[in-house]
C-alpha cells in the first residue's frame, strides 16, 4: 500500500487510547471493551516494544485481511467513553465513569488513505493494560509532559474525525466549553452538566497530587473556567449534589477554589502563583480590586526572579497603586525587567532615559542609553509595545546632536513596522506622508488610503477626516468620488470630538454635501466646533449673529477717541507756533464748532489755562485740565476712560511746552519769577517750587 500523509499526533493519541481500528470503508465505532488480562497472540519482542512505546507519536495498527471489523474501547478512570452503549462491555474489569453525553455524527466516513498507513511493527491494542486507579502513562512520560493528570477526556472528535485539543491550562479561552456547546447548543444550560463532571474528575485527580505545577495548573484552569461562566440566575443541575445550583453560585465556588490553591502556593514561594494571585487582586477578578495585596505579591514574586512581576511592581511604584510613589525603586525594578529582555520594560526605560523622566539625569550619556534601550525594544516589539519603533522613528527623523544622525529612510521603516503592529498614530502619519510625499517616498494614493483606513477603523478621528477628504475628491484608482461616503466619515470623526470634523459636517449640512440641506443641523455643528475653539466656526457664528457689525462699531469708537487725543496735541502745537494764549483759544473754538458736547471740554480747558496764567504768571492750568478731563470721563465706557487717562498725560506734556512759550513772550513775568530767589518769604519759595515742577 502506498504511503499516505502523516496522522496528527493528537489524533494518534486519541485513537490509541480508544483502540479504534480502521478499514477502507470508513470509521466505525463499536461500544465494547476488552478484558485487561486478555491474551494476544504476539511474540515477546513485540510485547517489549509495545511497553516502551510513546503513544503520543504512535501509528495506527494495520488490520489483517482475516481480522474482523471490531472496534474496542479501553478507558481509564479519567477518560470517558464517546458513546453511551455499554451493554456488551465487561464492567468487572474496570471502574465505570459516567461520560459526557456527546452525540457524534459519524455519517461522513473517512477512508484509511486520508488517515495514513501504519507500519507492521506498530503496537497492538493488547499493549494498553491499565489498573482501576492509574492511566497508561509511565513516570518518565509524566516528567516529559510536565503533567500528572490525564486530560485526554478533553479531546473531542467531530463528524469529520478531526481531533481538536482544548488548551486547558495554556489559554484564557476555555475551548472545551465552546466545543461542548456546539453539540448541546450555546443557550442550553445543560451544556454545563458534562463539563461539571469533567471538572469533578479533574479535581479528584489533583487532590492525589502534591506537585506544585499540577496544583497551579488546576488553579489556573478553575480561574479561567470561572471567568468564562456568565453570572446569571440560570439553574444548572449538579450530579454530585441534590438539587440545582445557579451559575452565579457556581462561579463564586470556582473563584474561591482557585484563590485557595493560589494562596497555598504563594505562601510556599511559588512565583507563578504569586503573580497570578496578584493579577487577580489588581484586576478585581476575585470580587474587588485590592492593590495593596497585589503589590506585596508582585514584589515577592519579583524577588524570586519573576520578570513580569518586576515590571508590574515598577508600575505600582510609578503610579502609587497599593504603595507610595517611589521613582527610584520603580526604575530599579524596571531595569531588572529590561535587563531580561522584557519588551515593555525596555520601551519604558528607553523613553524615560531619553526624555529625562522619573528622576533620571538629562546628560548626553543617559539620552544615548535611552536610544539603545528603544532600539532593543523596537527589535522585540509586539502589539503591546508597538509604540517603541514609533518613538525611535521620531528620534531618527529629527536627529539628536552628533550622536543620532537624521535618517528619514530608517525612520520610515520604523513607522511602517509600528503601523504593521497596529500602532494608530504611525498609521495616520504614514497616510499623511503618502498623501503628499516627501524626500524619501513619493506620493501614493493607494497607500495613503490604506493607512488612513487602518487607523480610522481603530477609532482615530484624524484618519476619519482624511478618508472624508479622499472620498470627497476621489482617490483613483482606489475609488471614485463619493460624497455620501465622505459624509459618513465626517460624521464619525465629528462624533469622536474632532473640531475640524465638526466644522466640516456643518459645512456639509449647509451646502447639502452627501446629505439633505439642513441649516438647523449645520448651525448645531458649527456651535459644537466653536465650543471646541475652532476659529472658522467662531467666525461663522459671528457673521450669523452680527458680531462683525458690533465689533466694527467698537473699533470705530476707539478710532474716534484716538483722534481726540491727536486733537489735543494739535491744539498745543498750534499754540506754540502762534505764541499767544488768545489765539490758541480762538483756534480751538473754531475747530470744535461742529459738536457742542465736544466743544465744552477743550474750551473750558483753554479758558482755565488762560485765567491761571494771568493770575499767577507761572502756573499753566494743567491741574485744572486734569480735573476737567477726569470729570468728563465718568460718563464714558471703560475703554474710553482708559484712553482719556492717556490723554491727560499728553495734555500735561503739551501744557508744559506752552509754559516755556509763555516765558519767552512775556519777559516781565520771567524776571519776576527770578526775584523770589533772593527773598526769604515762604510764599515765594512755594511759588518757586511750583515753577520748578512745571518746568521739569
From Swiss-Prot:
Residues 129-139, 576-593, 605-634, 651-661 have a biased composition (Polar residues). The modification Phosphothreonine is found at residue 564. The modification Phosphoserine is found at residues 148, 561, 563. Residues 37-67, 90-145, 576-696 are annotated as: Disordered. Residues 680-696 have a biased composition (Basic residues). One of its GO terms (cellular component) is plasma membrane. Pfam families: Sel1. The keyword Repeat applies. InterPro entries: Chitin_Synth_Reg, Sel1-like, TPR-like_helical_dom_sf. Keywords: Cell membrane, Lipoprotein, Membrane, Methylation, Phosphoprotein, Prenylation, Repeat. Belongs to the SKT5 family. May interact with CHS3 and seems to be an adapter (along with BNI4) to link CHS3 to septins. This is Chitin synthase regulator SKT5. It comes from Saccharomyces cerevisiae (strain ATCC 204508 / S288c).
Amino acid at each position: 500500500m502506498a504511503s499516505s500523509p502523516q496522522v496528527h499526533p493528537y489524533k494518534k493519541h486519541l485513537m490509541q487510547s480508544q483502540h479504534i481500528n480502521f478499514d477502507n470503508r470508513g470509521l466505525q465505532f463499536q461500544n465494547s471493551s476488552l478484558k485487561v488480562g486478555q491474551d494476544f497472540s504476539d511474540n515477546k519482542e513485540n510485547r517489549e516494544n509495545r511497553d516502551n512505546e510513546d503513544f503520543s507519536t504512535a501509528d495506527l495498527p494495520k488490520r489483517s485481511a482475516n481480522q474482523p471489523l471490531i472496534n474496542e474501547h479501553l478507558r481509564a478512570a479519567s477518560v470517558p467513553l464517546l458513546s453511551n452503549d455499554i451493554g456488551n462491555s465487561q464492567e468487572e474489569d474496570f471502574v465505570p465513569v459516567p461520560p459526557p453525553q456527546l452525540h457524534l455524527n459519524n455519517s461522513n466516513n473517512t477512508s484509511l488513505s486520508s488517515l495514513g498507513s501504519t507500519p507492521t511493527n506498530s503496537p497492538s491494542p493488547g499493549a494498553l493494560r491499565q489498573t482501576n486507579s492509574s492511566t497508561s502513562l509511565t513516570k518518565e512520560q509524566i516528567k516529559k509532559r510536565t503533567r500528572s493528570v490525564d486530560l485526554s477526556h478533553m479531546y473531542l472528535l467531530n463528524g469529520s474525525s478531526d481531533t481538536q485539543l482544548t488548551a486547558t491550562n495554556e489559554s484564557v479561552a476555555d475551548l472545551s466549553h465552546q466545543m461542548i456547546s456546539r453539540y448541546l447548543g450555546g443557550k442550553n444550560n445543560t451544556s454545563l452538566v458534562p463539563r461539571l463532571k469533567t471538572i469533578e474528575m479533574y479535581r479528584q485527580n489533583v487532590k492525589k497530587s502534591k506537585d506544585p505545577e499540577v496544583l497551579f495548573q488546576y488553579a489556573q484552569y478553575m480561574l479561567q473556567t470561572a471567568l468564562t461562566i456568565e453570572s446569571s440566575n440560570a439553574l444548572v443541575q449538579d450530579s454530585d449534589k441534590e438539587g440545582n445550583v445557579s451559575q452565579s453560585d457556581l462561579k463564586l465556588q470556582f473563584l474561591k477554589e482557585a484563590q485557595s490553591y493560589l494562596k497555598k502556593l504563594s505562601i510556599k514561594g511559588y512565583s507563578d502563583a504569586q503573580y497570578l494571585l496578584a493579577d487577580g487582586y489588581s484586576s478585581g477578578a476575585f470580587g474587588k480590586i485590592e492593590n495593596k495585596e497585589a503589590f506585596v505579591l508582585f514584589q515577592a514574586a519579583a524577588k524570586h526572579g519573576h520578570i513580569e512581576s518586576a515590571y508590574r511592581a515598577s508600575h505600582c511604584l510609578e503610579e502609587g497603586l497599593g504603595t507610595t510613589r517611589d521613582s527610584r525603586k520603580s526604575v530599579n525594578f524596571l531595569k531588572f525587567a529590561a535587563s531580561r529582555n522584557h519588551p515593555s520594560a525596555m520601551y519604558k526605560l528607553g523613553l524615560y532615559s531619553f526624555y529625562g523622566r522619573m528622576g533620571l539625569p538629562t546628560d548626553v550619556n543617559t539620552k544615548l542609553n535611552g536610544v539603545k534601550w528603544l532600539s532593543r525594544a523596537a527589535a522585540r516589539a509586539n502589539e503591546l509595545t508597538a509604540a517603541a519603533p514609533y518613538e525611535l522613528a521620531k528620534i531618527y527623523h529629527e536627529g539628536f546632536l552628533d550622536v543620532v544622525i537624521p535618517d528619514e529612510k530608517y525612520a520610515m521603516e520604523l513607522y511602517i513596522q509600528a503601523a504593521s503592529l497596529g500602532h494608530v498614530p504611525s498609521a495616520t502619519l504614514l497616510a499623511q506622508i503618502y498623501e503628499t510625499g516627501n524626500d524619501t517616498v513619493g506620493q501614493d494614493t493607494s497607500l495613503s488610503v490604506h493607512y488612513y483606513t487602518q487607523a480610522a477603523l481603530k477609532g482615530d478621528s484624524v484618519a476619519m477626516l482624511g478618508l472624508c477628504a479622499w472620498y470627497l475628491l476621489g482617490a483613483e484608482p482606489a475609488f471614485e468620488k463619493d460624497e455620501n461616503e465622505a459624509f459618513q466619515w465626517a460624521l464619525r470623526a465629528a462624533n469622536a470630538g474632532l473640531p475640524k470634523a465638526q466644522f466640516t459636517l456643518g459645512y456639509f449640512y449647509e451646502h447639502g454635501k452627501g446629505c439633505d440641506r439642513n441649516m438647523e443641523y449645520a448651525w448645531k455643528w458649527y456651535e459644537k466646533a466653536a465650543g471646541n475653539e475652532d476659529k472658522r466656526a467662531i467666525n461663522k457664528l459671528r457673521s450669523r449673529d452680527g458680531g462683525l457689525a458690533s465689533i466694527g462699531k467698537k473699533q470705530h469708537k476707539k478710532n474716534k477717541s484716538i483722534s481726540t487725543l491727536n486733537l489735543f496735541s494739535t491744539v498745543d502745537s498750534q499754540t506754540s507756533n502762534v505764541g499767544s494764549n488768545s489765539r490758541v483759544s480762538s483756534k480751538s473754538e473754531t475747530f470744535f464748532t461742529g459738536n457742542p458736547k465736544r466743544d465744552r471740554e477743550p474750551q473750558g480747558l483753554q479758558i482755565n489755562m488762560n485765567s491761571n496764567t494771568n493770575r499767577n504768571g507761572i502756573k499753566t492750568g494743567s491741574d485744572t485740565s486734569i480735573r476737567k478731563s477726569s470729570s468728563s470721563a465718568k460718563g464714558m465706557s471703560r475703554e474710553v476712560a482708559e484712553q482719556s487717562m492717556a490723554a491727560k498725560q499728553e495734555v500735561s506734556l503739551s501744557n508744559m511746552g506752552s509754559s516755556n512759550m509763555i516765558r519767552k513772550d512775556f519777559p516781565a513775568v520771567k524776571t519776576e519769577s527770578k526775584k523770589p530767589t533772593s527773598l526769604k518769604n515762604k510764599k515765594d519759595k512755594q511759588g518757586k517750587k511750583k515753577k520748578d515742577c512745571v518746568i521739569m
